[in-house]
Amino acid sequence: MSNLFRSLASSMRALSLAAPRATAVNTTKTVVSTHQTRCLSQGLLSRHICTPMCSHNRPVAVCQSAKNGLQSKQQSRGMKVHSAIKKRCEHCKVVRRKANKRQNGYLYIICPANPRHKQRQGYR
């Protein structure tokens, strides 16, 4: 078993690109010194606060189902602005909004089936 460990250690040293061997004591000293030179706010913000919804507390199947749920939700952005707006599908509706005494308002196309069909008529 010790021969296996020695060969593994020697192969890891060979892969380390001829860097000097670091001991555990040296690495802990450098970590401690970098944490001492930070501001208090940086230290607090960089720490990971474990909550019930952390990814390492949940099983993998739950994490993947949550990711799939986020991908299936469609994000709606702004509207397309055209001088001539058209209905693109049977679900599209023409709506006139922001009308007052001095202005006729804007014509909008809204579509509950496909949010990409949202349009607003440009200035004339």
From Swiss-Prot:
Domain of life: Eukaryota
InterPro entries named among the record's database cross-references: Ribosomal_bL36 (IPR000473), Ribosomal_bL36_sp (IPR035977), Ribosomal_LSU_bL36 (IPR052010)
Keyword Ribosomal protein: yes
Subcellular compartments: Mitochondrion
Keyword Ribosomal protein carried by entry: yes
Alphabetical GO biological process terms: translation
UniProt-listed HAMAP family: Ribosomal_bL36 (MF_00251)
Biological function: Component of the mitochondrial ribosome (mitoribosome), a dedicated translation machinery responsible for the synthesis of mitochondrial genome-encoded proteins, including at least some of the essential transmembrane subunits of the mitochondrial respiratory chain. The mitoribosomes are attached to the mitochondrial inner membrane and translation products are cotranslationally integrated into the membrane.
Subunit structure: Component of the mitochondrial large ribosomal subunit (mt-LSU). Mature N.crassa 74S mitochondrial ribosomes consist of a small (37S) and a large (54S) subunit. The 37S small subunit contains a 16S ribosomal RNA (16S mt-rRNA) and 32 different proteins. The 54S large subunit contains a 23S rRNA (23S mt-rRNA) and 42 different proteins. bL36m has a zinc binding site.
Protein known as: Large ribosomal subunit protein bL36m
Species annotation: Neurospora crassa (strain ATCC 24698 / 74-OR23-1A / CBS 708.71 / DSM 1257 / FGSC 987)
Gene name per UniProt: rtc6
